[in-house]
């Protein structure tokens, strides 16, 4: 069976065929039974340019009949499990295939889900890149567009939707209680964006009328019956209408697909999918529990991203997955633009600058990095290229392109592109040609070569001299505490680094063989709550001068900007259009004093516009975030940022400064403890929900991966103390209060790694106990003491008191954190599960507690949280059973598998899963070969043993596996290489830390 369609095979079919239409009948009348398969019947009419033989894609349990031009072929002879081979004649042809396709539990193909809340069954399809073949026979490649006519037979009480409106329904022949739904033909489109949903979905309808054309678009928003009370249709429709008005106006092209249904479905592998007329979303975007404004912003962004695809991707589609960026980069950029300009989220680019671009930077520093326009030889490679480069880097580079050619020229080129290639397929050259016509005064070809055809991220730095004669270099050329750290592949890319055994100042080896050293002694003796830190460098004496800060009165006497490329390891030069700003004090705030636009394409350039201006306290490159580049702050700007980032008034500038600090700590240019100190200072001061979420993500990565074991207790205790203090002082009912509560619980779950008797454990356990003592819907404003089992023994052995939430809170020894009221903090299921899972990891709650909580929350999310908590129990037998379940991944749904993996690898006080390191590497090929690519990806990534107590041994085992499996699928090797890179980075960053003294 050959499931991996190659580019060359697709090109051969394109040269041979032109597809006219598909008539597809799907019979899911048995969906609510134990049946594993359903009937799929396809009639495809097409033309062939010459006599030949070819194949159509189909992954099915069995094929019962194959007819080509009326001639019957033997299924046993022509079907191999993934392809049906047949002869074609020159001219018109008709192929009919009838098969039994399998209901999916992996989120690929036709996924079936039974809601544990009410027992109702739901179906939906998900195809990109090539899973339409799991549902019906088709030529599953983007450039063989056709008209699709769907008919679906389903139980009578099912709501059935597809890309087009329903034409009529009829009672089904031979299926009692079933109805057949006939849908209007689609417009010409690719197979991967066809869609069917069926089930007792509920929702709301609305409509939008285009003020320019008078066109009325029918709107729908749908979800499961158990979630419909939380649908928030008014908000969803509000964003939808704003987006339709924005895009139809900016693109000067009416919405082309008729209706606009949006359906939120369970166990979805993606955020959403741009099926024209029927956009599918994960129902994680339906908020049952309270969330911060960052979640509402994220949902709006996803809605607008998918809507942008109606033009970029659906109307005009890439020929092959090499040009995936022609839809994903554009949708990411356009979604962000519409978010900021057409909705209430006017600062939507803030979250993009800090969080979305961090994804791009990380991906771009892996040894597996690739150009935005990538080489995609097959569909397995395509599946993995839905990554931070194709999405976030591509979107950021498009922001740079808009800055380079101007907004009007960019949109003029886009409008020309839609009109010239509507309902067709394109490649890079087609868009560039349209853009060049719209911007004749710009060298589009050179820009595209520099930005789209190269990999890696530029690093921008600024060398300043101020009026007092001091020279200030960016971090990239200065010492962290006096000693320069160099890394291959930019900063600390561990593509790079293969940690050798040894103590502090370990030797690491780059991919080129260069030997690199980190600081011999960077002291982790710090208190994150107070911000006190002591640092020592790698100089001969280990002493350094204290960091110097600008007063704000200095004048700049010289300024030079420089660029270098991290991934290439050379001075790869790109044209940059950026803004530069100086930030200074205004009362207690830090605000822009001056800013200007600057263009350069050389390795370095003098910035004469800065001379004579105030240096302020922070000099910020890439002000307003027009560029895709990692900014290196000069040392004095860094010191100001570490102590005062929260005082920067403009949230976008604040996000950009934090982004620079994030990159510095990741690259080993800033001590981990210094970053955590800066982060601790921000707690309680930061009010932007997107920034809070981005900073906590980096801080938790520091705790999970980059803090040395010997410093772990001090680091987490400092952060927990700071977070609890900030939570106690937070405004009642605010985003900050909710974020801090979840942060405290996230940190608490990690205290399982702390030494016995650590006060950090007691601090976190006290708050978790407080959460579990309060029922859902009530305010956590009372004073409690103790935690489950705190009286001396874990779990049921503790003295307990029942609560209406279903989990007992045992009365035990008092401690300070258990007496804090958190007024305005309303308890919900999410908080309770976070608290319970933390206590489970600590051994202070057991299976009885989990069962009771699940009984009080029988929803699908409750079931998943119970699976995670159960697998997190720190008992050897639990880990054995979890591993056995994981190894039988085919019997689990995608989300249940991930939930069990999350619990299996949860922190615990004992190294309970060390024995599975070797089993992981022994099973890697089986993970990949025996499962669909989505399930395989979850296994390979989720189980990679970075949790091992012997990280260096894991790197060695990874290298041995890669050396022994050079012929393993490239997509599998890529995942393993990237996980190795993360682990090698962690080893390096830990090696730069000394023990406390």
Give the positions of each predicted feature.
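Non-catalytic accessory/interaction domains
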Residues: 154, 308, 375, 397, ...
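Surface-exposed patches in mature extracellular/periplasmic domains of secreted proteins
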Residues: 254-262, 321-322, 346-349, 413, ...
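Juxtacatalytic substrate-recognition/specificity segment
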Residues: 150, 179, 202-310, 314-324, ...
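Acidic/His-enriched low-complexity segments
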Residues: 1-258, 289, 361-362, 375, ...
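Cation-handling catalytic/transport regions enriched in His/Asp/Glu
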Residues: 263-265, 269-271, 290-295, 320-324, ...
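Acidic/His/Gly-enriched intrinsically disordered linker/tail segments
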Residues: 272, 328, 332-400, 404, ...
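Alpha-helical scaffold elements that line and support the substrate/ligand-binding pocket
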Residues: 306-317, 331-335, 393-414
């Amino acid at each position: 069976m050959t499931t991996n369609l190659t580019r060359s095979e697709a090109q051969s079919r394109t040269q041979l065929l032109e597809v006219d239409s598909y008539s597809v009948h799907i019979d899911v009348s048995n969906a609510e039974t134990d049946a594993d398969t359903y009937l799929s019947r396809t009639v495809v009419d097409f033309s062939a340019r010459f006599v030949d033989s070819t194949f159509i894609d189909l992954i099915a349990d069995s094929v019962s009949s194959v007819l080509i031009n009326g001639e019957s072929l033997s299924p046993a002879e022509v079907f191999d499990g993934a392809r049906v081979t047949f002869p074609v004649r020159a001219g018109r042809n008709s192929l009919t295939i009838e098969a039994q396709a399998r209901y999916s539990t992996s989120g690929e193909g036709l996924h079936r889900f039974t809601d544990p809340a009410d027992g109702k069954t739901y179906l939906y399809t998900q195809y990109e890149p090539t899973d339409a073949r799991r549902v019906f026979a088709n030529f599953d490649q983007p450039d063989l567009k056709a008209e699709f006519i769907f008919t679906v037979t389903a139980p009578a009480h099912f709501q059935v939707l597809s890309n087009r409106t329903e034409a009529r329904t009829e009672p089904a022949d031979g299926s009692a209680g079933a109805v057949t739904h006939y849908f209007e033909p689609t417009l010409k489109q690719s197979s991967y964006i066809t869609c069917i949903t069926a089930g007792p979905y509920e929702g709301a309808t609305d409509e939008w009328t285009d003020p320019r054309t008078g066109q009325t678009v029918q709107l729908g928003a749908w979800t499961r019956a158990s979630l419909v009370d939380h649908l928030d249709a008014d908000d969803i429709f509000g964003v939808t209408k704003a987006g339709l008005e924005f895009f139809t106006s900016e693109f000067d092209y009416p919405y082309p697909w008729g209706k606009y249904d949006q359906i939120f479905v369970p166990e979805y592998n993606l955020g959403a999918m741009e099926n024209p007329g029927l956009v599918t979303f994960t129902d994680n975007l339906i908020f049952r529990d309270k969330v911060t404004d960052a979640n509402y912003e994220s949902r709006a962004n996803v809605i607008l991203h998918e809507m942008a695809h109606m033009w970029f991707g659906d109307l005009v589609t890439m020929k092959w997955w090499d040009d995936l960026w022609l839809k994903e980069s554009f949708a990411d950029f356009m979604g962000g633009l519409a978010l900021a300009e057409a909705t209430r989220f006017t600062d939507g680019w803030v979250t993009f600058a800090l969080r979305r671009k961090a994804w791009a930077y990380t991906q771009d520093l892996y040894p597996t990095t690739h150009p935005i326009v990538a080489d995609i030889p097959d569909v397995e490679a395509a599946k993995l290229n839905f990554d931070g480069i194709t999405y976030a880097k591509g979107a950021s580079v498009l922001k740079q392109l808009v800055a380079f050619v101007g907004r009007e020229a960019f949109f003029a080129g886009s409008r020309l592109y839609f009109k010239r290639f509507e309902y067709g397929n394109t490649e890079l050259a087609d868009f560039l040609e349209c853009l060049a016509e719209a911007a004749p005064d710009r060298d589009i070809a050179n820009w595209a070569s520099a930005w789209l055809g190269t990999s890696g991220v530029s690093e921008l730095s600024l060398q300043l001299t101020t009026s007092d004669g001091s020279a200030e270099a960016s971090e990239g050329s200065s010492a962290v505490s006096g000693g320069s750290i160099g890394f291959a592949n930019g900063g600390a890319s561990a593509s790079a680094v293969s940690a050798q055994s040894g103590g502090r100042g370990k030797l690491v080896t780059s991919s080129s063989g260069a030997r690199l050293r980190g600081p011999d002694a960077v002291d982790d003796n710090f208190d994150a709550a107070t911000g006190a830190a002591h640092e020592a460098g790698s100089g001969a004496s280990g002493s350094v001068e204290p960091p110097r800060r600008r007063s704000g009165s200095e004048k700049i006497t010289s300024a030079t900007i420089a660029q270098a490329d991290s991934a290439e390891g050379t001075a790869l030069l790109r044209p940059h259009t950026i803004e530069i700003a100086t930030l200074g004090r205004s009362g207690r705030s830090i605000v822009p004093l001056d800013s200007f636009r600057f263009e350069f394409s050389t390795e370095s350039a003098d910035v004469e516009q800065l001379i004579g201006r105030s240096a302020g306290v922070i000099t910020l490159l890439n002000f307003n975030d027009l560029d895709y580049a990692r900014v290196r702050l000069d040392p004095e700007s860094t010191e100001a940022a570490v102590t005062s980032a929260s005082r920067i008034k403009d949230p976008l500038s604040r996000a950009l400064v934090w982004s620079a600090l994030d990159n510095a700590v990741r690259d080993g240019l800033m001590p981990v403890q210094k970053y955590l100190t800066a982060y601790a200072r921000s707690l309680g001061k930061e009010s932007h929900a997107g920034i809070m979420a981005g900073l906590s993500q980096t801080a938790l990565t520091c705790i999970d991966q980059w803090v040395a074991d010997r410093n772990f207790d001090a680091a987490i205790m400092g952060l927990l103390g700071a977070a609890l203090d900030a939570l106690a002082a937070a405004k009642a009912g605010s985003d900050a209060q909710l974020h801090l509560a979840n942060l405290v619980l996230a940190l608490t779950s990690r205290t399982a790694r702390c030494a016995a008797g650590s006060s950090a454990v007691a601090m976190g356990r006290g708050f978790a106990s407080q959460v579990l003592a309060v029922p859902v819907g009530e305010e956590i404003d009372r004073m409690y003491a103790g935690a489950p089992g705190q009286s001396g023994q874990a779990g049921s052995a503790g003295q307990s008191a029942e609560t209406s939430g279903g989990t007992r809170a045992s009365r035990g020894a008092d401690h300070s954190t258990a007496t804090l009221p958190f007024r305005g903090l309303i308890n919900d299921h999410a908080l309770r599960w976070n608290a319970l899972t933390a206590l489970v990891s600590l051994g202070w709650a057991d299976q009885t507690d989990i069962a009771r909580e699940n009984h009080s929350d029988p929803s699908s999310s409750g079931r998943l949280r119970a699976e995670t908590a159960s697998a997190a129990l720190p008992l050897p037998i639990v880990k054995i059973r979890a591993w056995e379940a994981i190894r039988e991944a085919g019997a689990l749904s995608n989300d249940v598998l991930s939930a069990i993996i999350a619990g299996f690898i949860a922190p615990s006080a004992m190294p309970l899963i060390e024995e599975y390191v070797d089993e992981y590497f022994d099973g890697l090929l089986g993970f990949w070969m025996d499962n669909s690519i989505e399930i395989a990806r979850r296994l390979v990534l989720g189980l990679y043993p970075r949790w091992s107590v012997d990280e260096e041994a894991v790197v060695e085992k990874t290298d041995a596996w890669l050396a022994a499996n050079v012929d393993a699928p490239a997509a599998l090797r890529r995942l393993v290489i990237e996980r190795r890179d993360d682990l090698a980075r962690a080893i390096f960053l830990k090696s730069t830390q000394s023990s406390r003294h």
